[in-house]
């Protein structure tokens, strides 16, 4: 195996582990608000502005079908609602409701405490550098997936 392959494998395995750790932590944070981490992810995606299901899926890097399933459950529980999309008649917008905002607000104190704990372990500068590195890694993978790295 080449050094580059070893790095790719190491990065992938580390990110898979991180994903599992974040899901475990997220479920623990979300449960007292009566939601799952999957629900919280979709709610967070539309917290600032309504988005179509496809837009949420693109932003999260997951399938449209999985977002659609969660969005339907959120709408059924009145945590989100569908709104008309002026840009596309068939692709409704997912918007968070007051009940959804209240659920996210209930998560806030525990979320803040977890962020403080992680910052205390890593240190603020290393925490920020880690986020920047993960963001660059994601952008590099987007470039490869899009094929724009081939010139």
Regions found by a protein language model. Name each.
Residues 1-33, 125:
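N-terminal leader segment of winged-helix/HTH proteins
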Residues 1-3, 125-151:
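C-terminal regulatory/oligomerization modules of transcriptional regulators
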Residues 18, 22-25, 29, 60, ...:
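Alpha-helical linker/hinge and terminal dimerization helices associated
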Residues 23, 72-132:
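Charged, amphipathic alpha-helical coiled-coil/dimerization segments
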Residues 24-66:
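N-terminal helix-turn-helix DNA-binding core of bacterial DNA-binding proteins
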Residues 44, 69, 132:
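DNA-binding alpha-helical recognition surfaces that contact promoter or target DNA
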Residues 44-48, 108, 135:
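Short, locally clustered residues in the helix-turn-helix/winged-helix DNA-binding domain
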